[in-house]
Design a protein with these regions (language model features):
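Pre-P-loop entry segment of helicase/translocase ATPase cores
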Residues: 1-43, 282, 288
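Walker A/P-loop
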Residues: 41-61
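Catalytic P-loop NTPase motifs of RecA-like helicase/translocase cores
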Residues: 52, 137, 153-154, 203
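Post-Walker A helix-loop "phosphate-sensing" segment adjacent to the P-loop in P-loop NTPases
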Residues: 65-72
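Inter-Walker segment of RecA-like/P-loop motor cores
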Residues: 90-143
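Walker B catalytic acidic pair
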Residues: 148-149
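Non-catalytic, compositionally simple segments
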Residues: 156-291
């Protein structure tokens, strides 16, 4: 059991290693970086161009979290149930075939994906569940709230319904600890919210969320993180075809800019969106490959 505890602690600190060893995935550098920050943050905001693989990364995070933290409850909400169900489909159709270990973790009897009831259950009692972003979802509880394309969800619904899900706390047994020791351990593990979306206009509330999270990120006592990636990263990593991007840019103009270009310049108390030039951000230089 000591060996299992050591490996569990190691993989919790290095989720990218878990993806390689257990899920047999070869992640790109930016995916490793984002995955680690997902585990570190209590509030994680990602503004990424379409085609960067937000849903795929969300699926990876949910699986790793549920395996390494038994009894985890993940609720996924989006503008439509179909968009939220895409995360579960990524797990079943893309992640599961690559890993016999993941197949062994999933409780097939309790797993179902349909329009009204979509969830993936794990044998360690963890669950990934799709919820509707409306008043009808009141009563759900979770440790992790994933908001996919959060700009499409009403801010009022997020504040009055979805955020209330996070009143549930994961409570491992800790059989060898006293009640006081258990309480201290429970306090160490915080519930968290993941906000993911493609770029949108500055006058939308989703932009204000980015600014607020950035200001909180500057406070070392808080674990909040925000970043934005433009379409150039997708091309650099081979996720987008440059010719297709050029054609779409010529055809759609401003719509393409809104959906794909999000160079966020952090300048004092504001985030300015620019359409050309390089990205200046307060991140370690070793994250990027300079050529």
């Amino acid at each position: 059991m000591n060996g299992a505890a050591l490996w569990g602690a190691y993989y919790r600190l290095n989720p990218d290693k878990f993806c390689a060893d257990y899920l047999h995935l070869s992640l790109k550098r930016f995916q490793k970086f984002l995955l680690v920050m997902m585990f570190w943050s209590t509030t994680f905001v990602l503004i990424a161009c379409r085609g960067l693989g937000k849903t795929y990364l969300s699926a990876i995070y949910c699986v790793v979290r549920c395996i390494l933290y038994p009894g985890t409850r993940v609720c996924i909400a989006s503008g439509t149930r179909g968009q939220a169900i895409n995360v579960l489909e990524k797990i079943i159709q893309e992640l599961k075939p690559k890993s016999t270990e993941l197949c062994a973790e999933i409780n097939e009897k309790e797993t179902r994906i349909n329009g009204n009831n979509a969830q993936i259950a794990f044998k360690n009692t963890s669950i990934i569940k799709v919820v509707t972003a409306s008043d009808s979802s009141r009563g759900n509880r979770c440790n992790v709230l994933l908001l996919d394309e959060y700009r499409l969800i009403s801010k009022d619904t997020i504040d009055t319904v979805l955020k209330k899900f996070l009143t549930f706390r994961r409570l491992p047994l800790y059989a060898e600890l006293t009640d006081e020791e258990k309480k201290r351990e429970y306090d160490k593990e915080k519930n968290l919210t993941l906000w993911l979306t493609s770029p949108f206009f500055k006058d939308h509330w989703s932009y204000t969320k980015c600014v607020d999270t950035y200001n909180a990120m500057l406070d070392d006592s808080r674990r909040q993180f925000v970043c934005g990636f433009p379409y150039e990263l997708s091309i650099h990593e081979g996720l987008l075809d440059p010719e297709i991007v050029a054609d779409e840019m010529a055809e759609r103009g401003a719509q393409f800019i809104c959906a794909h270009i999000r160079n966020q310049v952090f300048d004092g108390d504001t985030i300015q969106v620019v359409l050309s030039g390089s990205m200046h951000c307060k991140l370690p230089s070793e994250v990027y490959v300079n050529k």
